[in-house]
């Protein structure tokens, strides 16, 4: 885990409200933008967002490789946004595939998204519920010194739990910004993340390059500091959380 756990070591516990009843002194937020690599215009707009935005790029998109290089050059953290069942396509993981084929697809996807520091799942409500496949995945990510973000597209996911078992650098998404694609709803979800960060010490947000989402983020992200939020890179967030589950995802720091 030392490979990626840098920068926020001074904030060893971001969730004292879940352990000792005290209000957290710090409130951290991290943001991931998913589904990138499809549109140069949307990609460029996501890249231009202020602060340490993590860019999750889909391998089966026409601009995946070029945008990954561009994002890395700009100093952004790049992630592979790995398609998983019910997602389809040549890279998608499905429960009926043997581990050898899953490995082949992971290798091919990583080649399409150079500089990926970690992965998160695209869709995957069925695939992330498969313990054998997730156990293999987290072991492989650990071997490659990559981290995992469990997008938690299903309550049945075991991805983060399997990562925690072996000590893989990982964390889970807390808030989806844009399940409802209106500016009002997206702004509301952003404020939900702010409140959650103040309550438990940290919040991980995932959004998409929809015009409505990007417009809200362009307007609101610069205001986070005034709301008492410290906006940090996803790798710093892994360090802050120390691989512990939040109350919504587990008990006493252990994923359920």
Predicted regions and their residues:
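Catalytic-site microenvironment of enzymes
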Residues: 7-256
């Amino acid at each position: 885990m030392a490979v990626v756990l840098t920068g926020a070591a001074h904030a060893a516990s971001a969730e004292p409200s879940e352990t000792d009843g005290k209000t957290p002194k710090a409130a951290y937020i991290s943001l991931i933008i998913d589904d990138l690599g499809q549109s140069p215009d949307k990609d460029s707009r996501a890249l231009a967002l202020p602060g340490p935005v993590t860019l999750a790029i889909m391998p089966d998109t026409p601009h995946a490789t070029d945008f990954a290089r561009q994002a890395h050059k700009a100093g952004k953290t790049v992630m592979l946004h790995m398609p998983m069942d019910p997602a389809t396509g040549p890279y998608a993981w499905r429960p009926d595939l043997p581990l050898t084929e899953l490995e082949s697809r992971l290798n091919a996807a990583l080649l399409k998204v150079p500089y990926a520091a970690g992965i998160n799942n695209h869709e995957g409500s069925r695939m992330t519920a498969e313990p054998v496949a997730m156990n293999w995945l987290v072991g492989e990510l650990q071997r490659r010194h990559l981290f995992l973000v469990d997008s938690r597209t299903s309550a049945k996911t075991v991805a983060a739990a399997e990562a925690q078992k072996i000590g893989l650098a990982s964390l889970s998404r807390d808030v989806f910004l844009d399940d409802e694609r209106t500016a009002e709803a997206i702004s509301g979800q952003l404020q939900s993340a702010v409140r959650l960060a103040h309550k438990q010490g940290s919040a991980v947000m995932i959004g998409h390059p929809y015009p409505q989402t990007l417009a809200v983020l362009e307007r609101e992200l610069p205001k986070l500091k005034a709301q008492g939020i410290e906006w940090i890179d996803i790798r710093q967030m892994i360090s802050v959380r120390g691989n512990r589950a939040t109350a919504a995802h587990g008990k006493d720091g252990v994923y359920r």
